[in-house]
Amino acid sequence: MKTSEWIDISQPLNNNIATWPGDTPFSYEVSWSKEESGSVNVGKLTMSIHTGTHIDAPFHFDNDGKKVLDLDVQVYVGPARIIDVSNLESIGKKELESFHLEGVERLLLRTSSHGKAEEFPEVIPHLRADIASFLSEKGIRLIGVDVPSVDPLDDKELAAHHQLFKHGIHILENVVLDHVADGDYELIALPLALTDADGSPVRAVIRPI
């Protein structure tokens, strides 16, 4: 593979994609066809912000937290490292201490725990709150996971969410990493310019560096 080739690590958005139980189902339809308009097809999109590959803003879990447009877009573009943390129920400082993370600003975790975008998982590996201070000490500003949340699916406290942003670490969820190797990449995962939103879908892509 040429180093200039970008690799998509996003979940494709279509009407079969799984959503959080009780959340807004994804729907795309052509609401105004070329035959009707005489010139173009116009589509209509209905979705939850937390469908597919997306970022969380602090407003998602804190009424006083920053919204998407307040976030530093520089965090979502730049060098990233992918590491494998498969076969773990949870991930914290202990599990990451053996990895060389000096100089890493963006870290993507491959758990390989759930690869079906059409089925919402029942259980996922989650991040423990102690990971936040550890990542911060390493200089990491973004953490990405290949599951819908950094916290357990049924958790209401969202300790990992809170601690990560408390330590200045941004959250990227539902990336697709099973088709890429461990190593260093350039990442682009820019959120939309949504003024008042608690998160945003992203088109996440990487290329080897």
Swiss-Prot record:
* The protein's annotated pathway: Amino-acid degradation; L-tryptophan degradation via kynurenine pathway; L-kynurenine from L-tryptophan: step 2/2
* This enzyme's EC code(s): 3.5.1.9
Residue positions binding Zn(2+) 2: 56, 161, 173
Cofactors, names only: Zn(2+)
One biological process term from GO is:
anthranilate metabolic process
- Which residues are annotated as active site? 60 (proton donor/acceptor)
What are the alphabetically sorted keywords of the record? Answer: Hydrolase, Metal-binding, Tryptophan catabolism, Zinc
Q: What class of enzyme is it?
A: hydrolase
Q: Which residues bind substrate?
A: 20
Name the Gene Ontology molecular function terms of this record. arylformamidase activity; formamidase activity; zinc ion binding
Q: Which Gene3D superfamilies match?
A: Putative cyclase
**A Pfam entry, by short name:** Cyclase
Binding positions for Zn(2+) 1 per the UniProt entry: 50, 54, 56, 173
Enumerate the InterPro entries for this protein: KFase/CYL (IPR007325), KFase_sf (IPR037175), Kynurenine_formamidase_bac (IPR017484)
Q: Which reaction does it catalyse?
A: N-formyl-L-kynurenine + H2O = L-kynurenine + formate + H(+)
Cofactor: how and how many bound: Binds 2 zinc ions per subunit.
Similarity section = Belongs to the Cyclase 1 superfamily. KynB family.
Q: Which HAMAP family match?
A: KynB (MF_01969)
What function does the entry list? Catalyzes the hydrolysis of N-formyl-L-kynurenine to L-kynurenine, the second step in the kynurenine pathway of tryptophan degradation.
> Subunit details for this protein?
Homodimer.
Question: What protein am I looking at?
Answer: Kynurenine formamidase
Q: Origin organism of this chain?
A: Bacillus cereus (strain ATCC 14579 / DSM 31 / CCUG 7414 / JCM 2152 / NBRC 15305 / NCIMB 9373 / NCTC 2599 / NRRL B-3711)
